[in-house]
């Protein structure tokens, strides 16, 4: 079955809209900043999607894309945003250009303004399943939301993640453990990958290789989350072979799959940051 990720994303955005109407009555309008310094088509597209959705939802936005030439410039800009009370949350658009260390950059992000959930505080609290406030990484948390809104019980399941990035794989470890799953993380050096995926209840693949995950690698009862993105002959495709859609029990589509949830979770995180800032219980 192909999972309807559009409906799941809309459920999250509908909750955002409802909360926003309540905030507006108190004259609170969320303000989000996006810092984009990488001049490439993919980053331009992703930022455009975020700005468009923000405009649709009625969120104030500020795009910062000029005057940042070095890593020190970016760190200074982050500190400005950290101390600007008019900004409720911000995003550092990744990937960064050569000469910028994203790990160093994320060390400077204020957890209370961290929409992407990539600051060191957010990541450590996520892995520790901390009760302290922290935004959860958007793509990883979106994947968990797909499973939950599909009425799929995560508890006790074996989840295999083919990705170890800070955006998908690493935060998913904490989120799956939080939901009482058993987790296996695979990567380019993993041996006997097929043996890992074949026994998995949940397979998350996000490596950017079209048709990488094939029928002989999964069991028919698996829930496949395809978070890979590639362009083939002008079309956006995922990492899962097309015939998996008729083979496995559940699978997310590409496009209109995990990406939809990533965008929706951006605004969920923004709302959570605003609620925390103003101590609003909506």
Swiss-Prot record:
Q: Which E.C. number(s) belong to this protein? A: 1.5.1.5, 3.5.4.9
What Gene Ontology cellular component terms go with this record?
Answer: cytosol
State a single Gene Ontology molecular function: methylenetetrahydrofolate dehydrogenase (NADP+) activity
- Identify the keywords attached in UniProt to this record, alphabetized: Amino-acid biosynthesis, Histidine biosynthesis, Hydrolase, Methionine biosynthesis, Multifunctional enzyme, NADP, One-carbon metabolism, Oxidoreductase, Purine biosynthesis
KW Oxidoreductase (keyword) present: yes
Alphabetized Pfam families for the sequence: THF_DHG_CYH, THF_DHG_CYH_C
Name the HAMAP family on file: THF_DHG_CYH
Family membership: Belongs to the tetrahydrofolate dehydrogenase/cyclohydrolase family.
Q: What's the protein here called?
A: Bifunctional protein FolD
Underlying gene: folD
């Amino acid at each position: 079955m192909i999972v309807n990720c559009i409906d799941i994303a809309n459920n999250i955005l509908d909750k955002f809209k409802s909360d926003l109407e309540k905030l507006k009555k108190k004259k609170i309008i969320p303000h989000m900043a996006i810092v984009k310094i990488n001049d490439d088509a993919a980053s331009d597209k992703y930022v455009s999607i975020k700005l468009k959705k923000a405009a649709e939802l009625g969120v104030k936005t500020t795009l910062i894309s000029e005057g940042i030439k070095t890593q020190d410039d970016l760190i200074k800009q982050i500190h400005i945003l950290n101390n600007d009370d008019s900004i409720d949350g911000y995003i550092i658009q990744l990937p960064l250009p050569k000469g910028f260390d994203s790990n160093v950059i994320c060390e400077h992000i204020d957890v209370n303004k961290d929409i992407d959930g990539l600051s060191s505080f957010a990541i450590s609290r996520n892995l520790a399943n901390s009760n302290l406030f922290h935004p959860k990484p958007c793509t990883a948390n979106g994947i968990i939301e797909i499973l939950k809104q599909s009425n799929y019980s995560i508890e006790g399941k074996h989840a295999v993640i083919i990705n170890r990035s800070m955006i998908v794989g690493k935060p998913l470890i904490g989120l799956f453990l939080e939901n009482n799953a058993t987790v296996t993380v695979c990567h380019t050096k993993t041996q006997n990958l097929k043996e890992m995926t074949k026994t998995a209840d949940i397979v998350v693949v996000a490596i950017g290789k079209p048709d990488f995950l094939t029928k002989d690698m999964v069991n028919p009862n698996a829930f496949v989350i395809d978070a890979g993105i590639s362009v083939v002959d002008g079309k956006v495709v995922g990492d899962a072979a097309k015939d998996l859609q008729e083979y496995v029990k559940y699978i997310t589509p590409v496009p209109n799959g995990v990406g939809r949830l990533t965008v929706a979770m951006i605004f969920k995180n923004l709302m959570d940051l605003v609620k925390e800032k103003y101590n609003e219980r909506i």
